[in-house]
Amino acid sequence: IREQQDNIIAIDNLRAVTISPLVESELEARFIEALKRMGKSLENFECRPEFKGTKAGWFIRSGEHRYFMEPQVDLNAEHGVSIFSRADFVLWPLVNKAAKPIVIFTDGFQYHKDRVDRDSAQRLAIVASGEFLVWSLSYDDVQNVLESKSVEPLDLFFGMPKEKRQPFLTKFQSLELLELQNQSSFQYLVNWLH
């Protein structure tokens, strides 16, 4: 303690102490908790802290798939990304090396409402690299999992009458979209991982 006394910082209370240096926001911490909770409803799902080399993150096992989820990843020209971006998380596939890593952003309205154009440009640059998939989750996406709320899913068919959906999807060999129509963005992500 004496050797480090010049580095000691006074704080008002313990709430001022960051619990995990791996996440930069409360929403990111909630995302981890929501991922663990949603995973409990699945067979063969695990999310636990782990080191990969010198990097701290989480090991995720979902069915036969394995991922290392790394927080706070800078994506730039080295990754083929033309506009610098700092991803909240990247899920790096460990088993299926042909699978693209999934870049995850957790976007709370308070911090992103004035930068939608910038966020969109960054994410489009990540997609344009051809190296990654991009997933965005809102505060509500995460909070609904934590509160076990069912959500009104997006209308993937833009008002198309139900009786026309199956023939339409059959024509384009996309029947699996029928299963997705009643899921939230968070559920899509977990199912994608599984």
Language-model-derived ranges and their functions:
Residues 98-102, 128-194:
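Basic, glycine-rich
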